[in-house]
Regions:
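Conserved acidic, metal-coordinating active-site core of Asp-based
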Residues: 1-65, 69-77
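Asp-based, Mg2+/Mn2+-dependent phosphohydrolase catalytic module
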Residues: 82-124
Length: 124
């Protein structure tokens, strides 16, 4: 992964447009002042699916939690239980099935506790 940071948002937008033209690259931002460049085969989604396959897990048996663009490939896997943090960007909130508290309010612990408290209704 290559990360570039700059306070110049316009330059980063132009760089992103050019990088997105290169086949095989995934280009995302986690905040307006950065850009992340990876191979499309090194994204969280493909890594999670590889791990699941090795362990014999189906997407329906997986919970994934995220808040920014670099989580998109993981949270958009069909069938997965996708959870957006309260502080997630709109792109992530719009694709997730569930939402939890913000990362500053123990959002991951909160969603895990909710699942454990209601196991009968939350089938994995």
């Amino acid at each position: 992964k290559i990360t570039s940071n700059s306070p110049d948002h316009e330059s980063l937008k132009k760089l992103r447009v050019e990088l997105e033209k290169i086949p095989g690259l995934a280009v995302v931002s986690t905040v307006p002042t950065d850009i992340e460049i990876t191979s499309i085969n090194a994204q969280k989604g493909s890594s999670l699916l590889d791990y699941a396959k090795k362990d014999g897990l189906k997407p329906e048996e997986i919970i994934a939690i995220g808040d920014s663009e670099n989580d998109y490939s993981m949270l958009s896997i069909p069938g997965i239980h996708s959870v957006a943090m309260e502080n997630a960007c709109d792109m992530i909130r719009n694709i997730c099935v569930y939402q939890t508290r913000a990362n500053t309010r123990d959002g991951i612990a909160y969603i895990i506790n909710c699942i454990l408290a209601d196991r009968e209704n939350f089938k994995l």
